[in-house]
Amino acid sequence: MSRHYDKSLDNRLAAIEGHVRAVRQMLTEDKECEDILLQLSAIQGSLEKLGKII
């Protein structure tokens, strides 16, 4: 893998990590289920895109 490709993957993983942390915070703050599910859907989509790239 090239360095550019590695950085791209790292950026995507960092974004996914941020979404997961946001979901944890939402659960702690007892946010609406619909909002949490929307974030989980975004995480799933990001993971699928990452898998296709890899």
Enumerate the predicted regions with their spans:
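Solvent-exposed interaction patches of small proteins and small membrane subunits
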Residues: M1-I54
